[in-house]
Amino acid sequence: MDSLARQSAKICPFVSRVTSSMQQVQVLHKTNMSAMAQQCPVMRRAMAARGYVTASPPAGAAAADVGEARPITPVLERGTQERTFDYDGLFETELQKKRLDSSYRFFNNINRLAKEYPMAHRLEEEDKVTVWCSNDYLTYSRNEKVMETMKRTIDKYGAGAGGTRNIAGHNRHAMRLEAELAALHKKEGALVFSSCFVANDAVLSLLGQKMPNMVIFSDEMNHASMIMGIKHANVQKHIFRHNDLQHLEELLAMYPKSQPKLIAFESVYSMSGSVADIRKICDLAEKYGALTFLDEVHSVGLYGPHGAGVAEHLDFEAHRKAGLASPAQTTVLDRVDMITATLGKSFGSVGGYLAASEKLVDFVRSYAPGFIFTSSLPPAVMAGSAAAVFDQRSSLHLRQLQQKHTSYVKTGLGDLGIPVQPNPSHIVPVLVGNPDLAKRASDILMEKHRIYVQAINFPTVPRGTERLRITPTPGHTNDLSDVLLDAMDDVWKTLQLPRVSDWAAHGGLLGVGEPDYVPEANLWTEEQMSLTNDDLHPSVFSPVEKFLEVSSGIKA
């Protein structure tokens, strides 16, 4: 203790000031160190922040504090003339940066009309526009079955869940939804989160924190939620070039197979429409001993015979014939360790989820703060989401109609020479290449043509690749598409925006006008597009009845 006191006197100016000898320090320690520590500006704050195992202090703690309390004269008082930090000034400076680089966001007041989809009104209900950029890909937000299910549920169970899943917020709606999601992806378990942003952040950060020496490999175009989760994981990470599997393998080869590794990527990248080679990524994961973390946010509902996403689509026939059962052979869907996705796009409501093995789901359920310490989704939301997942599973025609409308728009824009970034998916990214012009193009579409298409600028996309992002749905008929095409042609003429030939004259960009670019074939083949709901397995037309044990907790 003498050694500790000597060290304290050397390090702490407070100790050296209030003690004239080491004997005094020793006496201080033995008699009244607690009271003296309260006079130290550092220790006073540290002692005020007491920790307890429970959420509240143990009984008697407050009384003990009162018994030890003594009148304290502050040792150090700040000068009354010292200026307060200019908080508003900092906020304004940061906002001005975004205005100057054209990344400041303006929100459009868009109120989508369920009975007039894809119409919406702005501030005034008579001021109507056609929405062409919603992520409600299959229009389930206004599906009659979904809305009726939500109405019945809210009438019976009220507006909110009442708490976290651990405290009063766990119910049959959560269990039914998780059973449907696990069945959709043919995984042992599923776990519902308040959003897929939260799911990605919670799962990735937890795995990094719990696995010793984990290394994460992330596609450079991954969503902000995955980037945030990887940052919170606080582990070694490598960013591989977008869809560049040679680069990914070079990075994986740097580490022994026994070291924990995870590859994080998306199936469909929402701002470009590019698609990952999931099969080859699984090959690399197995070769180098890595887990696979696949975000299917922009593909669930849209790909595969049952809407499970691109991983299912890659073995389309095997899954179509097997229905809810797993095919006899190993599929890409089997090989992906973790799938995350959203309830807020193709399924029309809100929320996110993880589908994985029972042990992994139970691990996340038991340890992830982003799941544990947040209120459960409302019963009506979960019931409506389960109804949407079930209904779309047997609605092959909706997926096909969305693909047909997308193809019509892409072909029409191509005929006009309007530059669409080529891709094999349902996304229609129209290249502008300038943030101010992209914003003006969006404004003209809205004000002159009553068409809402959002401009996409930095930081969502790299500078110089600014674009308009169009997302046709089953509700966007060919007649509506013709109106859009005429409006786009007018905007390109008005603003004298570069067409495909103009991009080609400068060497091209992002596949637009690039002389050696070879476009990928669409994910949906003509044979798949010719199928009907009658070609689906009978098992997909019945809801999943059995709840998952992992949803409530597995009994030892």
From Swiss-Prot:
Q: Which residues bind substrate?
A: R105, S218, K237, T460
User: Which residues are annotated as active site?
Assistant: K345
UniProt cross-references to Pfam families, sorted A to Z: Aminotran_1_2
Positions annotated to bind pyridoxal 5'-phosphate: S270, H298, T342, T374, S375
Compartment(s): Mitochondrion matrix
Q: Which PROSITE patterns match?
A: AA_TRANSFER_CLASS_2
Q: Which GO terms describe its biological process?
A: heme biosynthetic process; positive regulation of organelle assembly; protoporphyrinogen IX biosynthetic process
Q: Name one GO molecular function term.
A: pyridoxal phosphate binding
Mitochondrion: present as a keyword of the record?
A: yes
Q: Per the entry, which co-factors are needed?
A: pyridoxal 5'-phosphate
Primary role: Catalyzes the synthesis of 5-aminolevulinate (ALA) from succinyl-CoA and glycine, the first and rate-limiting step in heme biosynthesis.
Protein family:
Belongs to the class-II pyridoxal-phosphate-dependent aminotransferase family.
Please give the PANTHER family that the UniProt record associates with this protein.
Answer: 2-AMINO-3-KETOBUTYRATE COENZYME A LIGASE, MITOCHONDRIAL, CLASS II AMINOTRANSFERASE/8-AMINO-7-OXONONANOATE SYNTHASE
Question: What is the protein's given name?
Answer: 5-aminolevulinate synthase, mitochondrial
Species this protein is from:
Eremothecium gossypii (strain ATCC 10895 / CBS 109.51 / FGSC 9923 / NRRL Y-1056) (Yeast)
**What gene makes this protein?**
HEM1
